[in-house]
């Protein structure tokens, strides 16, 4: 069996069906004796260019180990499913199990966002306490 990285884009109007599609595709691979090494749902993202007047798509990435037969069946499913607007299958030398760069970048962004929000909240709380103390002193 060979290792593959599969990315497919789902039409944004069909985003709610992504879970079922992923389940169906993973079942197809596992029933043929294959393995899912990594599954990442990147969510809705802006496309670099419009595809059939669609500017956003739901991205899903799979790293799998499967037979050629299972891969051909998966590609047929992509081809005949109108919700899948693009797909890419890349053969890999070995299984990739770590997080993708896309997911790492997203986590870094969310961590930075949280750090930016925390100091503002701490400063506003400190500022409120000092103001209330000043007003208490003014009353005395």
UniProtKB/Swiss-Prot annotation:
Q: What is this protein called?
A: Small ribosomal subunit protein bS6
Composition skew (Basic and acidic residues), residue ranges: 103-121
Instruction: Return one GO MF term.
Output: structural constituent of ribosome
Q: Which UniProt keywords apply?
A: Ribonucleoprotein, Ribosomal protein, RNA-binding, rRNA-binding
Signal peptide (from-to): none
Cellular component per GO?
cytosolic small ribosomal subunit
Record the organism. Ectopseudomonas mendocina (strain ymp)
| InterPro entries named in the record | Ribosomal_bS6 (IPR000529), Ribosomal_bS6_CS (IPR020815), Ribosomal_bS6_sf (IPR035980), Ribosomal_S6_plastid/chlpt (IPR020814), Transl_elong_EF1B/ribsomal_bS6 (IPR014717)
Q: Which GO terms describe its biological process?
A: translation
């Amino acid at each position: 069996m060979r290792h593959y990285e599969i990315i497919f884009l789902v039409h944004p109007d069909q985003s709610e069906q992504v879970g079922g599609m992923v389940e169906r595709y993973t079942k197809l691979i596992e029933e043929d004796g294959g393995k899912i090494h990594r599954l990442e749902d990147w969510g809705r993202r802006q496309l670099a260019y419009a595809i059939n007047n669609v500017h956003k798509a739901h991205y899903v990435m799979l790293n799998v180990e499967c037979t050629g037969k299972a891969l051909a069946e998966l590609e047929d499913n992509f081809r005949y499913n109108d919700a899948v607007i693009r797909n890419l299958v890349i053969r890999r030398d070995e299984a990739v199990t770590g997080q993708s760069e896309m997911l790492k970048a997203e986590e870094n962004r969310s961590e930075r966002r949280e750090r930016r929000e925390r100091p503002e909240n701490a400063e506003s709380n400190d500022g409120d306490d000092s103001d209330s103390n000043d007003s208490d002193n003014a009353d005395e």
